[in-house]
């Protein structure tokens, strides 16, 4: 997949300089930081620089914008507004899609000093797990495109901007719809396993039953809101 996008001119080699969030494995520009911290997780960032391959995300800015503005691809509307105002209108920057600072991961076959960054291999897992470009399974044509992607709001950008652009690059059909849901919060902050502030759903299910818990969650929380 990486080689195909490279061969069609959508991946090129360059150098990345920017503010890096280690837990999120994401680079950010100064303008994207919130109070000098990662806009996704709120943790500290640090300056980093490395040779890398980039995906020409900027090339797909117009078709992605048209996709979002259609009102048919992403819900709720508040997420559409966030994507357009926070990312599309300021201008999409080309996306860093390889790393040299660690060795674990899928190596770039034509440049083994680089490993493929998680947002390429993780997103395309939707396709490769069903047999796309491999002979382990043969379900891709049966099940793709996906009917729905249901994702947390912190990864809406990856599923509604980056993912469609990469699928366009590969000439593959897009998912029919992406839904970006809000967070469950406690004491004003996001519930997070890494922060250790999660209410154990298994205990609630044991106490009240699985169906009662599902009904409570669906009935109580407006979709898309925290």
Predicted regions and their residues:
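Short metal-coordination and nucleic-acid-contact micro-motifs, chiefly zinc-binding Cys/His arrays
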Residues: 17, 34-35
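The −1 position to Zn-ligating cysteines in a subset of zinc-ribbon hairpins
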Residues: 4, 20, 37, 95
């Amino acid at each position: 997949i990486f080689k195909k996008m490279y061969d069609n001119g959508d991946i090129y080699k360059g150098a990345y300089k920017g503010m890096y969030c280690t837990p999120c494995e994401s680079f950010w520009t100064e303008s994207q930081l919130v109070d000098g911290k990662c806009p996704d997780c709120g943790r500290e960032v640090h300056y980093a620089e490395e040779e890398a391959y980039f995906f020409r995300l900027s090339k797909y800015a117009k078709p992605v914008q048209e996709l979002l503005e259609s009102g048919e691809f992403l819900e709720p509307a508040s997420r559409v507004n966030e994507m357009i105002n926070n990312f599309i209108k300021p201008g999409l920057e080309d996306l860093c899609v390889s790393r040299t600072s660690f060795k674990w991961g899928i190596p770039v076959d034509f440049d083994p000093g680089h490993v493929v960054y998680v947002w390429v291999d993780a997103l395309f897992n939707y396709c490769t797990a069903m047999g796309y470009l491999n002979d382990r399974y043969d379900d891709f044509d049966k099940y793709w495109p996906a009917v729905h992607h249901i994702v947390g709001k912190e990864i809406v950008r990856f599923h509604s901007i980056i993912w469609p652009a990469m699928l366009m690059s590969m000439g593959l059909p897009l998912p029919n719809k992406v839904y970006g849901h809000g967070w469950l919060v406690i004491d004003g902050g996001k519930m997070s396993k890494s922060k250790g502030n999660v209410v154990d759903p298994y205990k609630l299910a044991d106490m009240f039953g699985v169906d009662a818990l599902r009904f409570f969650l669906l009935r109580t929380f407006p979709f898309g809101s925290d």
